[in-house]
Amino acid sequence: MAKLVGWGVIINVKAKASQNLDYRVTVDDLQNWEAQYGRIPNGAVVVMNSGWHHKYPNKTEVFGTESTTDPTTFHFPGFHENAAEWLVQNRNIHVIGVDTPSTDYGQSKTFPVHVILGRANIPGLENVANLDAIPEFGSLISVAVIKLQDGSGGPTRVFATLPPTNDCFMSTYLNIGLTFIALVISMFLTAD
């Protein structure tokens, strides 16, 4: 259960995915995120934001084909196996997620990202929604699962929490601090 909570790392590849339906998150994408925000934190939940979540519930758009029952025609972004392997070998992540139907891209035949994640016992989240509401850095993501026996997957409820804004945070703690000081002063004034 502890592996189902972690710092949110949102990898924004919307521009690249809009130009290439079969785009795959690369090691360069991950390193570019780190150049902007710092090292991916231990226990991170790394999620690709390709903008695909806006295509739901239109199956033709989600699967990138008119033949939504023929997997050989699927076109949607995912993680490149080198990026998944890099995360497994070099970062202590808890979860990988995508806003598409699979962590592997649509044209995958052997599903190497699934294999890499499974071998490392790292859950993969698919069809994650509302990613534009989460900052690329600074959220805490929790994955609530249902109990299944002998299942390889199932529905989840994924949610992100954000720290309070600095103004709100400071004002709350300033009020608490001033109240504490007032109580201490009143104790000294009333003491004989």
Identify the residue ranges that each predicted region occupies.
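C-terminal GPI-anchoring signal of eukaryotic secretory precursors
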Residues: 164-178
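Active-/binding-site microenvironments in catalytic and ligand-binding cores
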Residues: 1-167, 186-192
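Cleavable N-terminal signal peptides of Sec/SRP-targeted secreted and luminal proteins
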Residues: 176-189
